[in-house]
């Protein structure tokens, strides 16, 4: 009887050991999975950083002046095209934004926004547009880069400004051979161009690239913020023009949403930017068409977002031909290389971030 009792006791001990072993095994398994997931995420971030700066290791590489990306020596100061691109719902999806070096988004009239997208002529883009009419402030921004302005007509003030200030432009009204009209789109949302056509204009007229005044750029080699500003929302007071930028920590960039959907260009490429600037500017309505006058020189408030955080600062443009620069706590902002997207808003705009 005592032997049976001892066997039962020993059997209970083994059950306890067994259950404890099982518990320990699953606990270790859970921690291992957690560790591997965390390690994988960090590895992805590091790989992304390596990919973004790997060109730096090649011989004779230098930063492209328009966006800070490393390119072969001799390609840093190519001619730049500043293309006025439609953003009406009937024009979407637009072509070219996913490959742009720099984009300004600003109201054209009546809370309807339009893009001024900058492209270095070393890019091979088969289709860019729809191309629309220009506004005076677009002319000012194009001049900052000595860019060739690409547009289809414009407001009276803008066309007069182009003529008076002798801004180099390719107006579709007088240069139709460098554009085409798509049969599947209705006017005025059907005018497109390509970098091949624009470069043929450049070559035909024996143009020379002028020096670009560059911003400062850095390599992405620091710790990335994870909690400060994952979403930036700009509400242009129209459901069709509500913009959100959501921070992607894996790639250290901002994914664009338009009307609450991921914004993709006509080639199904997501619109992603390395730097987001919200630039508050003095604005007034000047005519019955609700066109605007935007003061592009002087200084004002700005919100500068990169590496997962937004910082309040100021923008300054000391003259009509100088480059707009951005400052936080008195120091000029050093941007990540890649696409910078400038959201131009009225002074009283409220930005959620």
Regions found by a protein language model. Give the residues of each.
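Sec-dependent signal peptide cleavage junction
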Residues: 30-48
